[in-house]
Amino acid sequence: MEVCNTDAEGRLILADAISYVQKQYQLDSILDICTLTGAICVGLGEYTAGLFSNNDEMATALMDAGKKVQERCWRMPIEEEHEEEILNSNVADLRSMGTGRYGGACTAAAFLKQFVKNDLPWAHLDIAGTGMYSKTVDWVPRGGTGYGVQLLIEWLLNKK
């Protein structure tokens, strides 16, 4: 792996965790939630998380759960071009970041996707924006939000 920026270390640790749980456990899906990229804040602001997934059914279930508990998420793409950027290294099998300036949240998700077994439903929630609010919104005070706790519970309660 070509490590392109040592300040983007979170995705390396998360990739290890994704690999580890697949080797150690019988899984029917993987959901990771983390404050991964500032790029998602640029695209969605601080009130909606970025959702990336290799599975439409899982993505829809997560968006529905988020709507129900007022923890919004928006599905973002992992395009073929994002994956090509991750796989385009002159010195390694893959890069930890994309090759360009744009689409940082998408290329970060494309990087994580490389560690998920092809047939395993997976979703990644980038909560870099939603993890902290700059002002009080409804019942959520300024500061740390706990975003994702209610969404995760709702999703698990309704998981088939």
Regions from the language model: what does each represent?
Residues M1-K160:
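A generic structural signal for tightly packed, nonpolar segments enriched in small/aliphatic residues
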